[in-house]
From Swiss-Prot:
Active site as annotated: 322
Pathway: Nitrogen metabolism; urea degradation; CO(2) and NH(3) from urea (urease route): step 1/1
Subunit annotation: Heterotrimer of UreA (gamma), UreB (beta) and UreC (alpha) subunits. Three heterotrimers associate to form the active enzyme.
Pfam family, any one: Amidohydro_1
Required co-factors: Ni cation
Cofactor note: Binds 2 nickel ions per subunit.
Protein name: Urease subunit alpha
One Gene Ontology biological process: urea catabolic process
Keywords, sorted A to Z: Cytoplasm, Hydrolase, Metal-binding, Nickel
Record domain Urease: where: 131-569
Amino acid sequence: MPYRIDRRTYAETYGPTTGDRVRLADTELILEVEKDYTVYGDEVKFGGGKVIRDGMGQGQTSRAAGAVDTVITNALILDWWGIVKADVGLKDGRICAIGKAGNPDISDGVTIPIGPGTEAIAGEGHILTAGGIDTHIHFICPQQIETAIASGVTTLLGGGTGPATGTNATTCTPGAFHISRMLQAADGLPVNLGFFGKGNASTPEALDEQVRAGACGLKLHEDWGTTPAAIDCCLGVADRFDVQVCIHTDTLNEAGFVEDTIAAIKGRTIHTFHTEGAGGGHAPDIIRICGETNVLPSSTNPTRPYTRNTLEEHLDMLMVCHHLDSSIPEDVAFAESRIRRETIAAEDILHDLGAFSIIASDSQAMGRVGEVITRTFQTAHKMKVQRGVLEGDNSRNDNTRLKRYIAKVTINPAIAHGLDHQVGSVEVGKLADLVLWKPGFFGVKPELVLKGGSIAWAQMGDANASIPTPGPVHGRPMFASFGGAMAPSCLTFLSQAGLDAGVPEALGLRTPCVPVQNTRGIGKAQMKNNIALPKVEVDPETYEVFADGELLTCEPAEVLPMAQRYFLL
């Protein structure tokens, strides 16, 4: 006769199953398991006296005959497409199966064969997500990479050459020489990388040159002059080469207003950075652009979410980042024009509605590279507390909201920049860039970060201890972050033109180089779970924001979860 087990004991042994609920960190966000792909009574688990042993859960299947390299057992997957319990099989650095692991000689329905060549990672009691993708990186210092991967981010796109004055302000790697050096530097960093060329030019020749040198996108920044002519020229180049254009528009409205920028874009695909405007853009109404079908709107994390400290910290931050002088009244006025409580408050709600589709960092240039995922789910928490249950959710769970917010830092930036054929989700065929979280530390401190199917970062105790767990326990780089294992565990994203020109061979790059693709002709409709297109209007006197005629406003948070409770300093 079958053995019956109560839900609590089952969850403690094999992780939560269908209908079980889990709180994320110390937030008010609750997920509920929608489906369990494992088989009751036939689950696999590693350990002494447990299932994955020779002749039991482990069969005789060789790697060549189909056994996986690694199995993650009983993981609770949170992704844009669902919240499910499953075993996950990894092979050749990629996700090869999501389903039921085990020994096909003794079990039915096995989709992930475990053999003598299979490693096991215990996913029970853990949440599994895709590695985060941050598409707004100022490459000011290489130490950002360690901070990013420690937070669960495994792909970084942006621009820069180090702590140059231009890089401190703008996400551009200008010119073929600098693009080449940054591509070579990427070989020594344990994440996926791609670099934006400078897009500010009124004629295309210098932009063509940068794309052929390997730039995976182009960045228009107001500090270099984001004029209608530059916008039109840059987008023309992008359309010819299939790369994305990112834009930081004209705060001072010197060359035109938001209407002029929209006209210059001419309905072409464009990724608008910090679309609310505190990070830069037409004052006070750049936020309007999130209602355009061809616009892929993102936020940077200093305004995520709106709190009692947001306005105060932004002024000094802005003065430093954009090389302004507090003794010059015009510089101070420029800074003050960008910081508006009304538009920042509206940004919270526009994210909750799915009108803003992406969240990124703006690393060391009005943003924090290690807080993208944290601030995303702080925003989700704040919106649940202030706005209540989202349409599609209920009193039991926040699954709709969670799938909306996880998409903002995984699949949507991947789609926007033509990376989604490689990364951005927990789906078969994708690079195995995966993050395991203890639920109590979700979004704050990952337990394990895999890059290309190998462990690159993990919480680890005293290296001289007799077991891995004695303190001090903190995140540390693992073997996939060292030596010859690093490069094959990562990808470098280039333009197809750069690959055709032989850039990887000419530079002697060791990291596999892949093209960005399908960046043109996409729009809000392609953003997963974030496709809202409200008509947004801004009162020019009060800065109040209206969406489809409804005032968007909320109070600043006085306290947030996922914050000081998790950090000693």
